Design a protein with these regions (language model features):
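Short, ordered, surface-exposed loop/turn motifs in non-cytosolic proteins
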Residues: 30-32, 39-58, 149-152
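A short, solvent-exposed beta-strand micro-motif common in secreted/extracellular proteins
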Residues: 70, 80-96, 208
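Short, acidic Ser/Thr/Gly-rich low-complexity loop/linker segments typical of extracellular
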Residues: 58-71
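Bacterial Sec-dependent N-terminal signal peptides
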Residues: 1-40
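Structured interaction patches on ligand/partner-binding surfaces of diverse proteins
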Residues: 89-113, 213-232
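Extracellular beta-sheet/turn segments enriched in Thr/Pro/Gly and aliphatic residues
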Residues: 22, 102-126, 239-243
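Beta-strand-rich modules
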Residues: 192-219
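Solvent-exposed loop/turn segments flanking beta-strands in beta-repeat/beta-sandwich domains
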Residues: 43-49, 145-169
Length: 243
């Protein structure tokens, strides 16, 4: 009986040693690296250097600055899940959440390479709504004016809340290309219904100028998209009633 007990103990000790060994293999560190591709507020390519990539919440702080090729390396980070913050003067701050840093030959390489643009230089100076049949038309003027020689990018936000903004909204549009002034968004009644707005509902809207590259990302805490490159100079919210 004693021999059997000793054998069981030996097996248990052996299992513990194996478990500890596997944990030790995972608890380690390596580099996180990657590239950025930088643009102006349109589609013009610019120098990729000078963007700071920071590990959010790291103590002590961990960051790196991109070189002329847009390359950065964050050395010897312990394995885990991280949020990387990309920032540079003139650019909306971009965040990459849930970077899974695990055992990989050569460390963790960030893919795909983010294309990041500058803050929108244009701004919205007026925005009004009109209902025509089963359509809602949002007429938007910008400064400088959109034209064939000067492309402007626009995005609108909708809500039942009169305080609608780029951070408080129920619906956000795609990024529209404007080569005219004013630019008119046409929203069909069927689209509004698909957004959750029924006939007779008062809907509040707000329009912002954006960059071609929005530097947008999903905020996992709010479940909303964040649009860092919007020019926040814009008129107060307007409204319309769903036809």
């Amino acid at each position: 009986m004693r021999i059997i007990a000793l054998l069981v103990l030996a097996v248990a000790v052996s299992a513990c040693v194996k478990d500890k060994s596997s944990i030790d293999e995972v608890v380690g560190s390596d580099n996180i690296s990657g590239y950025v591709s930088l643009y102006d507020d349109g589609v013009g390519k610019v120098d990729d250097s000078g963007m700071t990539v920071t590990v959010e919440g790291a103590t002590p702080a961990v960051s790196a600055v991109t070189d002329a090729k847009g390359y950065f390396i964050l050395p010897e980070l312990r394995y885990g899940t991280y949020t990387l913050v990309y920032s540079k003067a003139g650019y909306g701050t971009y965040k990459r959440h849930n970077v899974d840093h695990t055992v990989e030959l050569g460390g963790t390489f960030i893919t795909p390479t983010p294309s990041l643009g500058q803050l929108a230089k244009a701004s919205v100076v007026s925005a009004s709504a009109s209902v025509v049949g089963s359509e809602v038309k949002l007429s938007v003027s910008t400064s400088p004016a959109g034209s064939m020689a000067n492309t402007v990018y626009l995005r609108f936000f909708l809500s039942k809340n009169k305080e609608v903004s780029s951070t408080t909204y129920m619906y956000h549009s795609a990024n529209y290309i404007s080569n005219m002034n004013p630019f008119v968004f046409t929203i069909q009644k069927s689209e509004l219904e698909s957004f959750g707005y029924t006939a007779g509902t008062t809907v509040y809207f707000r329009v912002y100028a954006d960059g071609f590259w929005s530097n947008d990302y999903l905020n996992p805490e709010t479940g909303r998209m964040v649009f860092p490159n919007l020019n926040l100079t814009t008129p107060a919210p307007g409204s319309f009633v769903v036809p």
